[in-house]
Amino acid sequence: MNDDLRAIDRQLAGRETIAVERLEAWCGLSSYSRDVGGLLRMSEKLLGALEEFPADVDVRALPDEMTIDDAGEAIAQPLGRLIVARCRPEAPRQVLLGIHYDTVYPSFARERIRLLDGRRLAAPGGADAKGGIVVMLEALRAFEGIDGADELGWELFLNPDEELGSPG
């Protein structure tokens, strides 16, 4: 294992409980694509998590999605907020990361969250994609702790409407 990988391994050591607790808490928040209030609550959690990074964070309102109802009338469907975090945009190398924080599940009971085999969490949005967000943030956190991190810039997009086809 090279020095960078050892440094990343040290950064990740002991973080499993923190990551699982974060995932469980986030899966306990409804962030159904059409639940604008739930998306707002989830976006606030994400903004809180991004505070630990040396990144500039921008929150953008998306335009309403225009749909047609059963009577043929146009209706505006509000969407959640897009979150964009940028770290070291002047660095010689850049990485773009993107993931969504909405879920396909409408509001649900917290009882649907359960730990399987003491290690696997089964929960609405756990794999798609709140678990991916947790892993991505942990990886970024570990990366930020190694020598040479200043040579790489990154930009992270957190999308609130992927399950709808990203109309915003």
Show where each model-derived region lies:
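Acidic/histidine-rich catalytic neighborhood of metal-dependent amide-processing enzymes
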Residues: 121-123, 127-168
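Acidic/His- and Gly-rich active-site-bordering loop/insert found
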Residues: 2-124, 145
